[in-house]
């Protein structure tokens, strides 16, 4: 394929631009890049062609070297790798300092980096990054210049066919050589602890990094390598080093994806997938690859993929840990696997693996280059922190040490016991446990509380990368017989008080369940160092198998409760007592009231799962075969279906096979057994309280949206939610609004300002708005009397608020009505606040309701009107919709100028932001895994989030009092296929799938596939197909679809919601009346957002 080559000198540093000139003279037709064509041929990009492309870029971005040297210019462009590197090198040739920025960064993150580097100019693709550009323009600050990047056709006019005799004009040479410590390139950190930080690379760094073993080492590696590095992002330090530096210094070819932008400069580049990475390797003949571990985890169990990897000379990974199970399996299959280590802060200091490493399966171990000076800081056990020191031949990009120049990595390594010079990374000095959800648990405080037990000698929490944490406990005096389940249970009970105390001081995701307490073995005590402190890494390594086994038990949910002491008998009275004990323990020690909803007493889905599993484990511990068989009849949603102890005891007793369930007569005849009666009972309870409140507060005149001074003061609940964030941004930008009180619940995990900022960044809203003086955050408990506020704050609200927008509400379609009583109570408290206003007129009260409040409407009666319905049967169905109906009735009867806004499905915002946990993104992700999309005979009246927000504000700030009820749904709905087909097409295009992929099937067929995958589903199955968790919801959708198929009706919303009348709403809201239909552009935004957030 390639002609002979001449290597640049390796005995002295040589700069990137000098390397280009060297190859232009010595290796003009050696291919720096190759990519496959549609006809299975290859296109080669020679050093001659690439160097000329770099010069063409320089001519375009800075003609005749006009202007000032050293200008910092950001490069934000989602384009082909070939073009990206040519532009970056061309900018350097033109004495421009490029700042490579990931196009996935949020607008505030980009703004932060621009400000920190005094960068006011951006090279980009305006039509592709329109939302980013408009967002940056909207932030104010220094004026920014946006310049379109050169196109592939401009830079490579003879793509793959450039010859030396073709016309070409070199770019003028620089008058002076840049200083060694001048910055030649900016990269940035990942932003895992805040906004990404700019990282400057000087010319000295460039010279030294080109000589690093992780780059120069490819030069003489045997066998000769062709590098399949197409999947690396070019703006990342790894992509920059591997795709540009390595071929330049090692004279080696890199295989890329075929560029897509030659004929259409706005076309997106190929998105790497597990399939197209391997396909590109096969087509280009590349024999070396470097990828992130997630791809290897996908390939490890695919025979065809493993066969491809076996034929590679080197399979390298970096960027994160690879599980031992996967790595060992690949090595056992004959894959030449090895790890590479490096970061933007210090480059690529490790060597490529040698023959000994590959032949002995030492894939986790690495060897640092001889030129790399490391200070290994012993941690008191077998681990060492790696600290890289600056030398005359190795300059760090970042230096963070006080006593010497260098970079402390915080990475912990261990030495290989027999192979001198080999090291393995095993963790961080910062032992914060990052869960699979991304939530972070700080163990120190919880470990300290548990250690205070007289029965405990040592405590180490674990759970990094898992769904929940656990704790390893060493008993103080007598050892526990680990073969005796009763002894284990007794010890757990002895230390439970301290564990419970630790849980009370921790966020919900950090709490430790009794089943997650692992006890040390007498023959494997905890490792200790220094003054007797535990050595965490060494101990956790020793208990690796036991910890893995514990998580496997958790994953196999039907086995988890086996260590729970069962009830003495399976009667209702005994079960009530036993279940109450279990529930109290799972609710963090809160004494559970038997006839009150568990989810109103601190339960969540994880607690419900553990309680169900304890029931199953208790049944299976009995010798009675009939009782053991009954364990298989425990439904998945048992606790959701029976959400208090009395109902649960009755249901379990029936399943256990008791001849006559001893059901309390009051419960049997209560409203909980009659859905309509249940709604009316809860409504009656709070209506009675409301009547007493109205008598106490007296009368007011009809309200308007503003005070006498004409200024509006708004109390907004739920501002940190999806819709709430758009409402808050709109209110803060509105000049009519003088002040906004954002009332949100308290959270142990973070302050409300932090949560609000994170939501704004995710939705690319203007974070600067959150610094306005007109915004006041309030953390409160709306369910408590006076909303749990102190007298001063409460009075301040009574004396100033003119509009209340109540948006906060729990969203969970699995829960029964009783679980939403705290939300109903919170609505009552807010109504009470409004009625106690000291203003001349009471505040205008807007309740954000849902079309779900009409879920029981008889379709034969036509469309659902914009009126308050007094017949509770219209709301019979899910607890969510029923609770919204009750709140509607409460605010209507309050005497306030109150309006209930029944919202339909809220779609993604301007940047496509659509919460990943919502049912529709879950359907899309699951469809990708199932290989089919469901078709439904119904329509959708979805509205983009920012339009919903605007419509609500139209009503909130209307001059005249709006009516009691309005339906805020899209007045021009579209059919399900008109939405889902563009979504499916966008997924196929973004994932580079064959056009015939992901066919449509009937909803019932799709649900049947889902049910098959749900049987014996593991944690990994549920991660890939999250629709399993909403199986009942999707079954209901399929049931409605079958009814519609039989009747031929098409005038029903997806999910069975009837058509909603919107005439009144349209007359008040110009936003609603002027709304365009959703379509292909919206679908593309949603899919782009989901992919950027890692949904699939």
From Swiss-Prot:
One Pfam family of this chain: NAD_binding_4
PROSITE patterns: AMP_BINDING, CARRIER
Residues noted as binding NADP(+) in the record, renumbered to the chain: 720-723, 807-809, 880, 884
Function: Adenylate-forming reductase, a natural product biosynthesis enzyme that resembles non-ribosomal peptide synthetases, yet serves to modify one substrate, rather than to condense two or more building blocks. The A-domain preferentially accepts L-threonine as substrate. The natural product of the enzyme is not yet known.
Name this protein carries in UniProt: Adenylate-forming reductase Nps9
GO molecular function terms listed in the Swiss-Prot or TrEMBL record: ATP binding; oxidoreductase activity
Family in the record: Belongs to the adenylate-forming reductase family.
Protein encoded by which gene: nps9
